[in-house]
Design a protein with these regions (language model features):
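Asparagine-centered strand-capping/turn motif at beta-strand->loop junctions
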Residues: 119-121
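A short hydrophobic beta-strand segment most commonly corresponding to one strand
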Residues: 62, 82, 109, 124-141
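Short, conserved beta-strand element in jelly-roll/cupin
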Residues: 63-66, 75-92, 132-134
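Structural motif
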Residues: 89-91, 115, 125
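Short strand-connecting beta-turns/loops that link adjacent beta-strands
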Residues: 56-57, 78, 97, 123-124
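A short, N-terminal "cap"/entry segment at the start of jelly-roll beta-barrel domains
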Residues: 1-59, 72-73, 143-145
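Short acidic-glycine-tyrosine-enriched beta hairpin
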Residues: 96-112
Length: 145
């Protein structure tokens, strides 16, 4: 059995992000220009996520996570997703491709319907920029089975 969630706030909370605040998530939504330094100066070095772009075609979310944090294994039925690594290192597992280490400046693409999982493996907080369908459905395996 699979579980489906398309609410960004609950996805982040259920993936282990210690604090998620919807006002913070939307604080920089559709900002013309913002730097990672400005985001970190405002939000700090803890775990956080901000949606910097949102419209009927796509969304962009900057996600900062601590070493060892990541997300649950999941896929998206509606759309592909891609990420730009803004700072640090992540381990990416992609079904059919295996596990890879990605670092600052790398770009990762995952086709819709492909299981994947992400973990921060840096010694310090790492940041990725996720670009996908607005409020995309995340499909998870039911952990109770």
């Amino acid at each position: 059995m699979k579980k489906i969630d398309s609410d960004l706030e609950s996805v982040l909370i259920n993936d282990g992000m210690s604090e998620v605040n919807w006002d913070t998530l939307k604080k920089y939504q559709n900002t013309t220009n913002i730097s990672l330094k400005e985001l970190r100066d405002d939000l700090g070095l803890g775990s956080w996520a901000v949606r910097t772009a949102f419209n009927e075609n796509y969304q962009g979310v900057v996600i900062q996570q601590q070493p060892g944090e990541g997300n649950r294994k999941h896929y998206y039925p509606e759309a592909d997703e891609n990420w730009v690594i803004m700072d640090g290192e992540f381990e990416w597992w992609i079904d059919g491709k295996g596990t890879m280490k990605v670092t600052t400046g790398d770009i990762v693409n995952v086709k819709r319907g492909t299981w994947h999982q992400i973990t921060c493996i840096s010694d310090t907080p790492a940041v990725r920029y996720a670009i996908n369908w607005p409020d995309v459905s995340h499909v998870y395996e039911d952990e109770d089975e």
